[in-house]
Swiss-Prot record:
Segment forming the signal sequence: 1-22
Name under which the protein is recorded: Sarcotoxin-2A
GO CC, one annotated term: extracellular region
Annotated positions of the Pyrrolidone carboxylic acid modification: Q25
Propeptide: 23-24
Keywords of this entry: Amidation, Antibiotic, Antimicrobial, Immunity, Innate immunity, Pyrrolidone carboxylic acid, Repeat, Secreted, Signal
Upper classification of the organism: Eukaryota, Metazoa, Ecdysozoa, Arthropoda, Hexapoda
Tissues in which the protein is found: Synthesized by the fat body and is eventually secreted into the hemolymph.
Compartment(s) where it occurs, according to its Swiss-Prot or TrEMBL record: Secreted
Note: Sarcotoxin II consists of at least four structurally related proteins named sarcotoxin IIa, II-1, II-2, and II-3.
Annotated source species: Sarcophaga peregrina
Amino acid sequence: MKSFVFFAACMAIIALSSLVQAYPQKLPVPIPPPTNPPVAAFHNSVATNSKGGQDVSVKLAATNLGNKHVQPIAEVFAEGNTKGGNVLRGATVGVQGHGLGASVTKSQDGIAESFRKQAEANLRLGDSASLIGKVSQTDTKIKGIDFKPQLSSSSLALQGDRLGASISRDVNRGVSDTLTKSVSANLFRNDNHNLDASVFRSDVRQNNGFNFQKTGGMLDYSHANGHGLNAGLTRFSGIGNQATVGGYSTLFRSNDGLTSLKANAGGSQWLSGPFANQRDYSFGLGLSHNAWRG
């Protein structure tokens, strides 16, 4: 009961906060220097974990390393729990430009190490629409086990000014194959407020023979000052229905806009099925800072 009251209070604070507040082709030329000084961006977040402790994540990324044609990608990160256990750490390097991008990520903890390769392409279709394609593959090695999990993902999305649609496939080798289709629409938008709606369907086929579908929808509201609320309902065929709510708020933003502190809260409850009335809550804080050099 106390946790529910605490969650309700967090959501009330967030809700109150939200109410109160696009080059022609040329012959190769020497690569010009960066048009803006490089930026070191620091991100830190803390979130509750239903199994105990607080999940802490830290990320340091370097941006504006290239020029208006090509932008390198570089970041390091670490994630862990205050109760102890294995700490996930890794790094990402890549490059992007002219609507194309590619990156690799290496991560490891005390049990396994993973290597992820990703590529994406963004094709502009006029002034307000684009076609976005992404593919990725993650290979994992687990200490002491011969089985090497591999996760492959691919997606294609058409994004317009107010409408969007996507289809994706995730294959977890030896475990499952998931096909997801979704549609989104902007219901309302002005200088300060934005309201989006989305619906989706996922067909999950598991190697053990247990197959099921997930269908659902969500409403997502956001305010220009950095506040937002969302609510969704998901139906798991043969299992039950689950409702989710969440919100976030910008608690602090520096005058120069380089530093910000955000809070988020969320909760879910099973409405039917074998998990009926089971609830889960979360609360988190996120700190971001961009340090200009040069």
